[in-house]
A protein has these predicted regions:
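In a subset of proteins, long, contiguous C-terminal domains/tails are tracked
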Residues: 11-14, 399-400
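Extracytosolic ligand-binding ectodomains
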Residues: 2-4, 23-400
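C-terminal motif of bacterial Sec signal peptides marking the signal peptidase cleavage site
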Residues: 18-21
Length: 400
């Protein structure tokens, strides 16, 4: 349907080479920690079969620089499993979440993927991995062995085309990039746009997409005035900010996560308090508010999950997540939550954990979750409506 052997092999090679340079560190071994989402007594009291559970793997960085994303995936997955277990499980069987720490490393992800496929009779599917490059390293292994992978965060356009068993519950970066530019130009009325991006696969790809979009808007008087690439995790972006400011940027699109957006906002507003800053959904988190303080007021994002929605199901989810883990869920964690829900719903619908049947059902599924209405297209991608969000008085609110 979506692949040929040569294409898969080339993508695997490219991803492994690229991630050797840009991954966040590989670590010495593979960590797999099992976490049962419901207690034994809960399983017994509900009449669920806990001796033959349905296991869902969550493979993501549980340690290292990006651990908050992997931990968020796992927390959300356990919350969804708990919801199913409180209602009798899936096919009458207890749902269990099994965590694998890939450290956002291609090498670790390869080892983990090989371990998971060796146990595929016990694993119903994989939620993960986090970064696009790591996902694209592991995906051919899952595809070849007919193991379903749903990434809540991969945004590289080529990821889902690796195979029929490969899905993403995240928008392709070209669509989110277009939404970010739309905020800068049409909502905020800015014409002179700057870009600051992290020197990673995602940062390079995203900034390139933004450049292409801006190039196509020249006839509307929109121009890219400067683009600065920076190291992820740096404490000092003053040199890049000075160049963007000297170039006359009215708005800056930050191609990075909260640990880029927060310090850029702090340092830029010392130079130019009126600068407009636009970020992406991977920066939409409580960590941004904590790290950025007053400086992130006015930062804008396009997101497909808004924690302060008036929809009751979202309120219930946010309350349950906050009660369990002490903070509101991020957009990406919420996409992991829905990813588990879609996988379990497909299993329930076909009455079996056979991966071919479940895969076919996922392509047919219409799922209403906390991140909106989801339906996979023929390549395993989703198309969702964005909510435009900004920060006001230290809180996320919908843009006027």
């Amino acid at each position: 349907m979506k692949r040929n052997a040569m294409a898969v092999s080339m993508l695997l090679l490219a991803a492994m080479l690229f991630n050797a340079a840009c991954s966040a560190g590989s670590g010495a071994g593979t960590t797999a920690a099992k976490n049962e989402s419901g207690s034994q007594s809960a399983a017994e009291n509900s009449g669920m079969d806990s001796a033959h559970p349905i296991k869902v793997a969550v493979a993501a960085p549980m340690t290292g620089d990006n651990s908050e994303y992997g931990i968020g995936f796992a927390n959300a997955a356990k919350l969804m499993a708990k919801k199913w277990n409180e209602n009798g499980g899936c096919l009458g069987r207890e749902v269990q979440i099994v965590e694998y720490d890939d450290k956002n490393s291609s090498e670790e992800a390869t080892t983990i993927a090989q371990k998971i496929v060796s146990e595929k009779d016990e694993i119903a599917g994989v939620i993960g991995h986090f970064s696009s490059g790591v996902c694209m390293t592991a995906a051919p292994i899952y595809e070849e062995n007919h193991v379903i992978e749903i990434s809540p965060s991969a945004s590289h356009p080529d990821y889902s085309s690796i195979g029929d068993y490969i899905f993403r519950n995240n928008t392709v970066i070209s669509k989110e990039g277009g939404a970010s530019v739309d905020i800068a130009v049409n909502d905020l009325g800015k014409k002179k746009i700057g870009i600051i991006s992290i020197m990673t696969d995602w940062g390079t790809n995203t900034s390139g997409i933004i450049k292409g979009i801006l190039e196509g808007m020249k006839d509307k008087g929109v121009e890219l005035v400067a683009h600065e690439e920076v190291m992820e995790g740096s404490d000092d972006y003053s040199a890049a900010i000075a160049k963007l400011n000297d170039a006359g940027a009215e708005a800056v699109i930050c191609c990075g996560m909260y640990n880029l957006v927060a310090p850029v906002a702090k340092q830029y507003k010392r130079v130019n308090p009126d600068i407009a800053i636009i970020a992406f959904s991977n920066a939409y988190s409580t960590q941004l508010l904590e790290l950025g303080g007053d400086a992130v007021n006015g930062v804008c994002f396009p997101v497909i999950f808004f924690a302060d929605s008036e929809e009751q199901s979202i309120k219930d989810y946010v309350d349950a997540y906050t009660k369990a883990y002490g903070a509101a869920p991020s957009a990406l964690s919420s996409q992991a939550y829905d990813s588990v829900g879609m996988l379990l719903t497909a299993i329930q619908n076909v009455g079996d954990t056979d991966s071919e049947k479940v895969k076919d059902e996922l392509y047919k599924l219409d799922y209403h979750g906390v991140t909106g209405d989801t339906r996979f297209d023929k390549t395993g991608d989703v198309d969702k409506a964005f909510v435009k969000v900004t920060i006001k008085d230290g809180k996320f609110v919908k843009m006027d």
